[in-house]
């Protein structure tokens, strides 16, 4: 693996990700910042809405934006995973992405199969992490069911991740098996984010305002990633 400092590596990866997005979407983001801790890499993206997407957003076609962007992002993530595995010499376990179109922000979260060298696991926020797990479980129960397992991670002072496993109920599994994965994804996205934003007590847990909440699912692995971005 390259011996360059981790922060320099993150800056390079953020730049390469921006170029990759520009190549595939016709424009790149205004900014892309990388954060790492343990086995996780999070890229926080701002200013990434194309003129066509802006028109669709104004006309209320959010679902069309989401589905078309997901198709292109699957290609981007495949290239990004290959680049990251070469750079860190670690296998990528899973990749997630989500977008807040109204705020023109987004995130890409990568989970490697082991800790990134130089990215030390932060265990200082144990009370915050415990309360975060409890709150995510509470909302998960309202929306669907309690996850079989929930873990929370502090990636940086302003970035937190929550990973849930065993989240799908039987009717959702049947819908996926019958080919309704995209429809289910859009529906879960709208429903869960509504509860997270309007029923969650996350600002009390963090003692700071929350700038963004992102959620993505891997239906085939039956897991989900949530990303909380805090305001400075």
Sequence positions of predicted segments:
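Hydrophobic, ordered structural segments
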Residues: 71-115
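A cross-kingdom feature marking solvent-exposed beta-strand/loop segments within repeated
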Residues: 2-6, 28-30, 62-65, 82, ...
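Short, hydrophobic/π-rich interface segment
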Residues: 73, 77-80, 166-209
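Surface-exposed beta-loop interaction hotspot
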Residues: 100-159
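Extended, charged low-complexity segments
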Residues: 200-232
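N-terminal ordered "arm"
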Residues: 2-50, 54-58
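An N-terminal amphipathic alpha-helical segment
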Residues: 35-52, 141-177
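Inter-domain helical "communication" segments and dimerization helices
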Residues: 50-67, 120-136, 181-192
């Amino acid at each position: 693996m390259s011996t360059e400092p981790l922060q320099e590596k993150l800056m390079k990866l953020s730049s390469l990700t921006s170029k990759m997005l520009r190549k595939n979407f016709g424009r790149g983001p205004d900014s892309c910042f990388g954060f790492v801790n343990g086995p996780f890499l999070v890229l926080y993206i701002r200013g990434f809405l194309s003129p066509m997407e802006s028109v669709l957003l104004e006309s209320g076609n959010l679902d069309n934006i989401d589905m078309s962007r997901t198709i292109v992002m699957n290609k981007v993530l495949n290239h990004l995973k290959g680049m990251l595995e070469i750079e860190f010499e670690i296998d990528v376990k899973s990749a997630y992405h989500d977008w807040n179109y109204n705020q023109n922000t987004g995130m890409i979260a990568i989970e490697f199969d082991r800790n990134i060298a130089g990215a030390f696991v932060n265990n200082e926020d144990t009370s915050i992490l415990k309360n975060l797990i409890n709150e995510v479980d509470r909302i998960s129960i309202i929306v669907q069911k309690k996850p079989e397992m929930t873990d929370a991670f502090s990636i940086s002072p302003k970035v937190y991740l929550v990973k849930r496993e065993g989240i799908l109920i039987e009717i959702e599994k049947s819908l996926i098996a019958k080919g309704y994965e995209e429809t289910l994804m859009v529906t879960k996205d709208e429903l869960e984010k509504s509860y997270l934003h309007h029923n969650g007590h996350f600002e009390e847990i963090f003692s700071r305002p929350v700038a963004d909440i992102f959620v993505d699912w891997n239906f085939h692995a039956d897991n989900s990633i949530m990303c909380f971005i805090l305001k400075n």
